[in-house]
Amino acid sequence: MEDLAVQAEELGLSSFWVYDTPMVHGDPFAALALCAKATSRIKLGVGVTSPTLRSIPAAASGFASLNALAPGRIICGVGTGNSARRTLGMPPTKSAELETFTASLQDLSAGRPISYREGVRVSDIQFLHAGPQQLPTDPIEFVVAAQGLKSAAIAGRRRTGLLSFAILDPDAWRAFQRARLEAADGPVVGDSYLTTSLCVLGEGEDPHGDAVRDAIGHTVLSFLVFAADKPSFAEVLGPEEREAVQRFLTQRGTTGTAPDRFRRLYTNYLGRIDPTERDLILPSLIDKLALVGTRDNLLRRIAALEAAGVDELVIQPVVDPPTELAELAKLTA
């Protein structure tokens, strides 16, 4: 992990991220601690942690500890746990809980006390040490994961950045930015990050071929996982996409209503797809969810996203990470 962070820093990339989905991925704090010691400039982000996944004191201490290792380079991404919670067979947390969680982490990391509740008991808590973990002069950057306007508004009220997954429509990003600014009661500080997958095509290369499906299929499959796990969402998809969801359920040996479906649906979640799953990676979903094209085509798409408010592109490479990071660096140089 830290070798990739070092490479990303050497390539001039601005940030390096890990997930916080305990049933699928390793511990983000352990991973980023290694990355913090191996790097000196690049920002290190968790995308994202969520309420009920981690308690407020534990999460705040974890991020403060990382910030002590890499002062001013830590990004705390927070969200409802749309993936992490579903891997437990649980629904995402409510927006109100997300906002309270975000505010509490911001306050604790800045050395301010908060009101902490467990059941009917309430205490005022704050960090009780004065060591390097508490560095308000080197603040932690906060971003709220937003797949819709409600979360974008939370980012505005909390004056944070935004992080979104596989939303490549510039109009959607303009709407996010409007919602964030309209909800804010003062200046909004924080960049906007777009997480997706990337495949740079050679001239004449098939944009929907096997090589492309292997490179970006994990992003498309995550869309099908969500649709398979939430039948009400699948119902609004087109006929070809609904059929792909049903084939995916059949391949995984479950149904959209089985109580234990999450254990089958989220196996290898966001990992490189199996060759038997390539036929599920529909051309329409490739075009919608991933950045695939020639260099010139991708530069135009990235410029349009930048004009809509996206500050940084984040990718998850799965086939050949060093090469894919180098491709991203060339595009964004």
Predicted regions and their residues:
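An alpha-helical appendage that flanks or caps ligand/catalytic pockets
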Residues: 91-131, 174-304
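Conserved beta-strand positions in the central sheet of alpha/beta enzyme cores
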Residues: 17, 43, 75-77, 163-164, ...
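Acidic-and-aromatic substrate-binding clefts and catalytic sites of carbohydrate-active enzymes
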Residues: 20-27, 51-57, 167-173, 200-201, ...
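N-terminal beta1-alpha1-beta2 module of alpha/beta enzyme domains
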Residues: 1-46, 140, 318
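Conserved, mostly hydrophobic/aromatic
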Residues: 12, 35, 66, 105, ...
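Internal, glycine-rich beta/alpha segment that forms the wall or movable "lid"
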Residues: 58-190
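Active-site mouth loops of central-metabolism enzymes
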Residues: 49-56, 136-146, 198-201, 284-296
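Short, acidic/polar
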Residues: 1-8, 62, 146-153, 294-304
